[in-house]
């Protein structure tokens, strides 16, 4: 067993940011990480849920980053496959770049797969490319009138730019008014629960980045000319990603085991309820276990990935200004419910050029833009990794994703009633037949998505207040109230460890992660 180190870093949360921080501290410093996880599950929103032999990725996590440090981190812990996975063996596929000498996924579990990325929009009971492409099928599916209106709207948006004071204007500037109203307006309201005119453009700049109809045109020309550049191609247009054999939770569970092997401590069912601060420094935390027992732990640093409103509520022995409390309390979030369905087959079939088993659709996820149903996205777990599915050859394992707010009608609905509604919605839009449903489960995630409205616009005041607490570092999606991808959450942890190593109390490099204009993977 590794020797315990003298100085302690208290880490709130065993998601990607918290676990990355703990791992990096053990590898690069003489500090002892102690991780407190409120639930009994490793991985946060990047967990993998197991149900009757099937595995469900909550929200879908493509492993892709423009940051080489992150890519190398992933593939060092979980090497890239050196032989074909079972689905490629069945189909006789030989089109993937395998890692010579890498593990065989048919024989080994600690392996990361190379996967093709296919995401599409389902609208008007038809499939559209995501992002919207200029293929003939797009215009055929839209019809002549929508095509003319879309072309005119895009032309107007090229010569008349709106002030980007809202997400609505952000989208109109990039796609034109009519395409926005068709493909973005209703879906965005479904996801966030408010109209895009009330959402900040920040979300678009962080999630959509440089994607626009013009970017799609340039990418199409680049492909025609045979030119490919990862650095210059928008990340939403990159066509492959890597993915752990058993989903993201497998990687994070492995990281957790490595942390413990190296002497780090991970305490599960440990809800941090108080953070003691003296002379602008965190001195200790109180956590409550599953039996309700409160325990105090001292530390030299605190890395927090907990929601900002919970962090402010937990601050003790310090006079938190009323305005800071108000801003934190009013920060908006969007919650998330997934229904896992095991079905015999889907009604919709593969009409793409991509070869698939039993002619199944090739998509990893589908954006459901239909306005007569509440479902937001549909995951096809067979296509993420065939090893997520207990009976890959004979069943389809899918995830029906709903965006909601804690306490609203969807959130409060009884589980059986919710599952019935979800099944009925897929039947309604002709994706499944009810009699093909074999099994179902439901998973609910609180505060899955930080939202960009309300007191979010005053968040800088809270950041400034936190930065005055010398040894407090806010990391990850909820820790920074920023809609990060997994790699960004990891980078906040890496930058925090760098700051400690350098003895640098300036936390700007940590807050600055995910502010670059060309960073995101969103397809």
Task: Name these PLM-found stretches.
Residues 52-158:
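Dinucleotide-binding Rossmann-like beta1-alpha1 core, especially the glycine-rich loop
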Residues 28, 268-412, 416, 420-430, ...:
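Mid-domain catalytic core of redox enzymes
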Residues 17, 41, 309:
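Conserved Rossmann-like nucleotide-cofactor binding loop
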Residues 7-35:
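N-terminal Rossmann-like FAD-binding beta1-loop-alpha1 element of flavoenzymes
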Residues 443, 452-523:
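C-terminal lid/capping helical subdomain adjacent to the catalytic/cofactor pocket in oxidative enzymes
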Residues 26-51:
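Glycine-rich FAD pyrophosphate-binding loop
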Residues 136-138, 142-143, 147-278, 283, ...:
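Active-site/ligand-binding neighborhood in enzyme catalytic cores
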Residues 265-267, 438-441, 473:
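General small-molecule cofactor/ligand-binding pocket signal
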């Amino acid at each position: 067993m590794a020797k315990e180190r003298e100085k302690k870093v208290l880490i709130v949360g065993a998601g990607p940011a918290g676990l990355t921080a703990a791992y990096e501290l053990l590898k690069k410093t003489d500090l002892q990480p102690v991780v407190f996880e409120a639930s009994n599950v490793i991985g946060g929103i990047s967990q993998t849920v197991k149900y009757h032999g099937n595995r469900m990725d909550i929200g879908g996590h493509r492993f892709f980053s423009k940051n080489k440090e992150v890519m190398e981190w992933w593939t060092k812990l979980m090497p890239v496959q050196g032989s074909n996975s079972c689905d490629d063996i069945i189909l006789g596929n030989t089109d993937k770049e395998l890692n010579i000498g890498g593990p065989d996924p048919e024989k080994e579990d600690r392996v990361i797969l190379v996967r093709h990325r296919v995401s599409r929009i389902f609208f008007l009971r038809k499939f559209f490319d995501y992002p919207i492409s200029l293929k003939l099928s797009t215009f055929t599916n839209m019809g002549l009138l929508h095509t003319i209106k879309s072309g005119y709207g895009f032309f107007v948006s090229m010569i008349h730019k709106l002030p980007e004071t809202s997400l609505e204007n952000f989208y109109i500037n990039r796609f034109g008014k009519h395409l926005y109203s068709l493909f973005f307006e209703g879906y965005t309201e479904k996801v966030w629960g408010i109209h895009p005119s009330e959402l900040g453009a920040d979300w678009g700049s962080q999630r959509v980045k440089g994607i626009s109809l013009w970017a799609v045109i340039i990418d199409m020309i680049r492909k025609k000319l045979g030119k490919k550049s990862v650095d210059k191609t928008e990340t939403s247009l990159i066509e492959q990603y890597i993915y752990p054999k058993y989903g993201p939770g497998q990687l994070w569970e492995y990281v957790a085991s490595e942390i413990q092997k190296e002497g780090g401590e991970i305490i599960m069912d440990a809800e941090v309820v108080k953070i003691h601060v003296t002379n602008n420094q965190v001195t200790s935390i109180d956590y409550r276990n599953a039996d309700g027992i409160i325990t105090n732990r001292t530390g030299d640093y605190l890395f927090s990935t907990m929601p900002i409103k919970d962090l402010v509520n937990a601050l003790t022995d310090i006079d938190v200004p009323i305005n800071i409390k108000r801003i934190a309390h009013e920060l908006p979030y969007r919650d998330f419910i997934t229904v896992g369905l095991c079905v015999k087959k889907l009604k919709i079939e593969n009409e793409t050029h991509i070869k698939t088993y039993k002619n199944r659709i090739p998509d990893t996820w589908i954006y459901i833009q239909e306005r007569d149903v509440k479902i937001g996205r549909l995951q096809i777990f067979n296509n993420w990794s065939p090893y997520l599915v207990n009976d890959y050859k004979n069943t389809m394992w899918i995830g029906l994703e709903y965006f909601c707010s804690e306490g609203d009608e969807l959130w409060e609905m009884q589980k059986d009633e919710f599952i019935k509604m979800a099944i009925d919605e897929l039947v309604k839009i002709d994706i499944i037949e009810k009699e093909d449903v074999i099994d179902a489960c439901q998973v609910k995630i609180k505060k899955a998505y930080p939202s960009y409205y309300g007191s979010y616009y005053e968040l800088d005041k809270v950041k400034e207040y936190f930065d005055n607490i010398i040894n407090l570092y806010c990391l990850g999606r909820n820790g920074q109230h920023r809609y990060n991808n997994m790699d960004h959450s990891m980078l906040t942890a890496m930058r925090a460890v760098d700051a400690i190593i350098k003895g640098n109390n300036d936390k700007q490099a940590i807050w600055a992660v995910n502010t670059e204009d060309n960073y995101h993977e969103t397809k």
